[in-house]
Amino acid sequence: MESLINPSHGGGNYDSHSSSLDSLKPSVLVIILILLMTLLISVSICFLLRCLNRCSHRSVLPLSSSSSVATVTSDSRRFSGHRVSPETERSSVLDSLPIFKFSSVTRRSSSMNSGDCAVCLSKFEPEDQLRLLPLCCHAFHADCIDIWLVSNQTCPLCRSPLFASESDLMKSLAVVGSNNGGGENSFRLEIGSISRRRQTPIPESVEQHRTYSIGSFDYIVDDVDSEISESNFNRGKQEDATTTTATATAVTTNPTSFEASLAADIGNDGSRSWLKDYVDRLSRGISSRAMSFRSSGRFFTGSSRRSEELTVMDLEANHAGEEISELFRWLSGV
């Protein structure tokens, strides 16, 4: 009975256990609070750094883009300022190249296939506008060759230059003068077709034709005669040019017939208009190159002897350009 009434024997252990729990609760709470605060502070710092980084990128990008645009604009203006004259001369020469429709070319051979463009590798349609390169007598789609000539100043097939040199012009005009009395009213025009290159030997009938390599294809020039009326010729963008009664025959024979046909075309009063303009522009280009070479030699040479030699060379180049113009006027009777 006394043990039940007086619980002093087991009550001491219970009191010690409860007191230890009470002493542990504040320390645990403090540790948990410290951890939570550390976590919150670290997360806040991360978000703050990310926001600052985004703001800095937003402020730097407009400045860099504006500076790069200003640099590119100034460079383009500087280079465009230096290239005004060549680009203008180049565009004027391109505009002087003749344009005609493929339907205006009549083929004398009934077994002849339709021609193909060597740039886009597609067939010529009757209503397609073709542009002719007079120095090599190759014809292409006007849009195709215009895009090609923006970055390449040569023929896509034979790689002959668009802007002829003094020697090329003198050679062509000299042969023109010797063959002017032939009376053959013809102008050579090379139009061919695309053929996939094979491993087998080329047949003899194809070997007789003129063949050009275009990657994995061969461009075979048709060995037939064609005829085109001069009234179907347009010069550059002048689609309403005055028509004439003369005709220009397109011949795809050997290369030596080009000069004879060119002589006949020059001798014809009606068909020499666009060719005269083309040669005049080339002559002006030769004279401008001679003047630029002369000015650079005068300002950047160190000795008087060197300047005298350059002056003689410049006079010879200018004289060659004048001879070309005079020879052309004499041949055409201007």
From Swiss-Prot:
- Keywords noted in UniProt: Membrane, Metal-binding, Transferase, Transmembrane, Transmembrane helix, Ubl conjugation pathway, Zinc, Zinc-finger
Instruction: Name the chemical reaction catalysed here.
Output: S-ubiquitinyl-[E2 ubiquitin-conjugating enzyme]-L-cysteine + [acceptor protein]-L-lysine = [E2 ubiquitin-conjugating enzyme]-L-cysteine + N(6)-ubiquitinyl-[acceptor protein]-L-lysine
Region: Disordered; residue ranges are 1-20
Q: Name one GO cellular component term.
A: membrane
What Pfam families does UniProt report for this protein, alphabetically? zf-RING_2 (PF13639)
As for membrane topology, the entry says: Single-pass membrane protein
Q: Where in the cell is it found?
A: Membrane
The disulfide bridges present are none
SMART domains found in the cross-reference section: RING
Please state the Enzyme Commission number of this protein.
Answer: 2.3.2.27
Has keyword GTP-binding? no
InterPro entries from the entry?
A: Znf_RING (IPR001841), Znf_RING/FYVE/PHD (IPR013083)
A GO biological process held by the record: protein ubiquitination
Residue ranges annotated as zinc fingers (RING-type) are: 117-159
Q: Which SUPFAM superfamilies does the entry mention?
A: RING/U-box
Transmembrane regions listed in the UniProt entry: 28-48
Matching entries from Gene3D superfamilies are given as: Zinc/RING finger domain, C3HC4 (zinc finger) (3.30.40.10)
GO MF, any single term? ubiquitin-protein transferase activity
Q: In which pathway does it act?
A: Protein modification; protein ubiquitination
The record's comment about this protein's domains reads: The RING-type zinc finger domain mediates binding to an E2 ubiquitin-conjugating enzyme.
Family to which the UniProt record says this protein belongs? Belongs to the RING-type zinc finger family. ATL subfamily.
Name the job this protein performs: E3 ubiquitin-protein ligase able to catalyze polyubiquitination with ubiquitin-conjugating enzyme E2 UBC8 in vitro.
* Protein name as it appears in the record: E3 ubiquitin-protein ligase ATL4
**Taxonomic lineage of the native organism:** Eukaryota, Viridiplantae, Streptophyta, Embryophyta, Tracheophyta
